[in-house]
Regions:
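Aromatic- and glycine-rich beta-strand/loop motifs that create alpha-glucan
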Residues: 1-22, 238
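Membrane-helix interface segments
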Residues: 16-18, 90-96, 133, 164-169
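Helix-loop-helix units of permease transmembrane domains in multi-pass membrane transporters
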Residues: 71-103
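Transmembrane helix-loop junction
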Residues: 74, 87, 118, 122, ...
Length: 240
């Protein structure tokens, strides 16, 4: 499995997708830095909260759909899946490896976003920067990122059924817009792509829904998406 992950990273050297996702991750710190330059007053905790909110409820929806479309649809669009399966690698291991690669890639994107935000805060003149606040916010972002990755298993199904980058980007944009409208409503804890940040930041305490219910919905979403993607991927015939 480690060899497979290394191979996936080597493939990224010949693709511009990784650079695109990195630029997407840096767009949030850039916007926050511009806001600081225009005279917007903010604390270190405040700017990290802004970063986590917009990243996990808006930008990551689009970025993660692009990552999934690339990881799970590339072999279909490039017609290389049959060649890969001639190696000692089963469809099950290939699917698990793709999921692991998605989690690792998402972790890298989250770390880049957080690091960029800290740098933006420093360059923007925020004076109350502390290690404890930074580590706590980073922990919340990582928890939110893990939960968001779990909630994205239905997008894996979409990428397997329709391995088209444009379709995935449109789907990501639509879900981002939905998140914007739902995030401030009473239904947010019941939507997996919204509830992940509410759980990690403990903002879910402000809603009538408890953490266990939101987490259960999210895990069920993951289980359903994982099961369907496994069945579809392992049963579908591989075409040249």
């Amino acid at each position: 499995m480690l060899t497979f992950i290394k191979t996936e990273f080597l493939k990224l050297k010949h693709s511009k997708i990784f650079l695109l996702t990195v630029l997407g991750a840096l767009s949030i710190p850039s916007l926050l830095y511009i806001g600081l330059l225009t005279g917007e007053h903010a604390t270190f905790q405040g700017i990290l909260d802004y970063c986590a909110t917009y990243a996990c409820s808006l930008f990551y929806i689009i970025i993660f759909t692009i990552i999934i479309a690339y990881l799970f649809g590339r072999e279909y669009t490039e017609h290389t899946l049959k060649t890969i399966l001639t190696t000692p690698l089963s469809k099950t291991k290939l699917l698990i490896g793709k999921y692991l690669m998605f989690f690792i890639w998402a972790f890298i994107i989250t770390t880049i976003t957080f690091t960029g935000t800290v740098i933006a805060a420093y360059l923007g003149g925020i004076s109350d920067i502390t290690l404890s606040v930074g580590l706590n916010s980073y922990k919340e972002m990582l928890i939110s990122e893990i939960l968001l990755c779990l909630s994205f298993s239905p997008f894996v199904v979409l990428s397997l059924v329709m391995p088209n980058m444009v379709f995935s980007m449109v789907a990501g944009a639509i879900f981002s817009i939905i998140n914007l409208f739902v995030y401030t409503s009473k239904y947010a804890p019941y939507i997996p792509w919204c509830s992940q940040y509410l759980i990690s930041s403990n903002e879910i305490a402000n809603y009538s829904c408890n953490t266990a219910t939101s987490l259960a919905i999210l895990l069920v979403t993951f289980a359903i998406g994982l099961t369907i993607s496994y069945i579809y991927f392992t049963k579908k015939d591989v075409c040249l």
